[in-house]
Each structure stands twice: as structure tokens, then as C-alpha cells.
């Protein structure tokens, strides 16, 4: 007997086409999808970029000579399966805008300053219990031109790799209480309210370091009814 895992409902994950998110109109597939056969090779397993994950890769505030501007924060949590068990040795990558809401990217030219001490990218490997931890600065909101006076809520992009690089899930983590939630078509492309809130981190006073950094918890649940919504593009 062959058991297939059920595909999650469209309400729990963003659709490929969400007209309010205007760029999906051009990017979403217009023809039936084609299944590509996967063949094994020596590059099937994770190679973590060009070298192994270093102990300091999780700290985005120590990658340059000076300390970046902005509010220092800790972001941590667990990568979990549907039964709440930690998934060990998982490559977790993040990328984000700086405290002024600007990315180090040639396409991002909106009038906000770049920070020479902040690149905005980090990576970590989950431990034996599926736990990961990052130190970074809280990203700023930024305009993005989707519609009149369009601003993205503060967020951090997450990428989670499975046992091969074709097993990659991408999502975004938001911060609690952001007033921009109701105006953001990307956040609201996940139509199930409970699923949307699984993309919102929780403030973690217990793990806040007094006098140094606030802490936010963000658990990534890979599948099941409580799965973290993932991008489908």
C-alpha cells in the first residue's frame, strides 16, 4: 500500500497567483506544471555553500569591523516535524533588510541608507533537538511599489533545507503587532488567519538578554495541520 501525504489547502499556503500581489500576475505559471525526475549525484546532499557552516555565521552583528545600527535582537526556535519532534542538522538560512528597511541589492534603490556594517544574511545548523539561533538587528519596513503607499511589514526571510538542495522551503517571519499587516497583500495571500499567524514570531521575555537584546521565538513546522506557511513560487 502506498501512502501519499495530502497537499495542504490553498488557505494555508499562498497561491502562485494572488492578483493583489501584482508581480504574481506575471510570474505565476500559465500552463500545467511538469514533474521533473530527480537523479542522484555527488551533489545531492547539502554542501552549505562553498564551506561548512561556521560557528559565527548565525551572528549577523559581527560580520564586519563595526557593529550595525539598529535594535539588536535574538531570533530562535526549533525546526519541527508534524508531531512536534525536532529535526536535527537542518540548514537554516536568513536574509533581511537593515534597520532602515534597505537590502544590499542592486535592485533596492529606495532612499534609505545602507549600513556598511550589515550585510543582512546568516545561516545556522539546527542541533540534535532541532534548535537554531540567530543574532541580528530588527529590520525596518520599506516601500515596494505594489500599489499606492505600499509598505512591507518588518520581516525576515527564512530558508530551510532538507537532506538535498531540492528539498528547500522558504517562508517569512514577521513581528507581533505590526500595524502594516492588514495592508500587506503578501502576508494576506495566506487566507487562513490561523496559518497567517504562524508566520508571526512571539516575543520571548524569558530568553531576552537584559541590557543587551530582546528575543523573539519562531518555530518552523515543516508539515501537518500546524505547518508554517511556505512560499509556492
State where each predicted segment sits.
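Beta-strand-dominated extracellular/periplasmic modules and repeats
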Residues: 2-233
Amino acid at each position: 500500500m502506498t501512502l501519499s501525504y495530502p497537499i495542504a489547502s490553498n488557505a494555508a499556503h499562498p497561491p502562485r497567483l494572488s492578483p493583489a500581489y501584482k508581480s504574481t500576475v506575471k510570474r505565476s505559471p500559465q500552463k500545467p506544471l511538469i514533474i521533473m525526475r530527480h537523479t542522484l549525484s555527488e551533489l545531492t546532499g547539502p554542501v552549505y555553500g562553498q564551506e561548512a557552516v561556521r560557528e559565527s555565521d548565525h551572528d549577523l552583528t559581527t560580520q564586519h569591523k563595526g557593529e550595525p545600527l539598529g535594535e539588536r535582537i535574538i531570533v530562535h526556535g526549533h525546526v519541527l516535524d508534524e508531531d512536534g519532534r525536532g529535526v536535527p542538522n537542518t540548514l537554516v538560512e536568513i536574509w533581511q533588510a537593515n534597520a532602515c528597511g534597505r537590502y544590499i541589492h542592486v535592485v533596492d534603490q529606495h532612499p534609505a541608507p545602507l549600513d556598511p556594517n550589515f550585510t543582512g544574511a546568516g545561516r545556522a545548523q539546527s542541533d540534535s533537538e532541532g534548535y537554531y539561533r540567530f543574532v541580528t538587528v530588527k529590520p525596518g519596513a520599506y516601500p515596494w511599489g505594489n500599489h499606492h503607499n505600499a509598505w512591507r511589514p518588518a520581516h525576515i526571510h527564512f530558508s530551510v533545507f532538507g537532506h538535498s538542495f531540492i528539498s528547500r522551503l522558504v517562508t517569512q517571519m514577521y513581528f507581533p503587532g505590526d500595524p502594516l499587516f492588514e495592508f500587506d497583500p503578501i502576508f494576506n495571500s495566506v487566507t487562513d488567519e490561523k496559518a497567517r499567524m504562524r508566520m508571526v514570531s512571539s516575543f520571548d521575555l524569558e530568553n531576552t538578554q537584559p541590557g543587551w537584546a530582546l528575543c523573539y521565538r519562531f518555530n518552523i513546522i515543516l508539515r501537518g495541520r500546524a505547518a508554517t506557511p511556505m512560499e509556492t513560487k
